[in-house]
């Protein structure tokens, strides 16, 4: 399956605990769509978040974010994992 990296430019009031809950919800909802949210990185000060996701399509990845918590990414790009 393709691997995608998404970027959320600014999530107002971003907190580590709330983000961990949102990621857990992505994992839960994603199971029903064949989508696996693998990891995420964030900067609490700027509200910027990056998510790494294994999904059959960009639309499937977006659908999971929308259904899980409504925080849809500003950008989504297909990536290849390196060594």
Predicted segment positions?
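An amphipathic, aromatic/His-enriched active-site/gating alpha helix that lines ligand/cofactor pockets
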Residues: 56-83
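Short hydrophobic/aromatic beta-strand micro-patches
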Residues: 9, 52-54
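Short S/T/G/P-rich N-terminal loop/turn motif that feeds into the first structured element of a domain
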Residues: 1-32, 36-38, 42-47, 64, ...
């Amino acid at each position: 399956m393709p691997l995608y990296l998404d970027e959320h430019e600014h999530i107002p009031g971003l907190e580590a605990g709330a983000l961990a809950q949102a990621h857990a919800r992505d994992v839960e909802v994603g199971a029903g769509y064949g989508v696996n949210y693998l990891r995420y990185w964030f900067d609490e000060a700027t509200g910027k978040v990056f998510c790494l996701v294994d999904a059959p399509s960009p639309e499937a990845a977006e659908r999971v974010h929308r259904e899980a918590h409504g925080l849809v990414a500003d950008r989504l790009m297909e990536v290849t994992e390196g060594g």
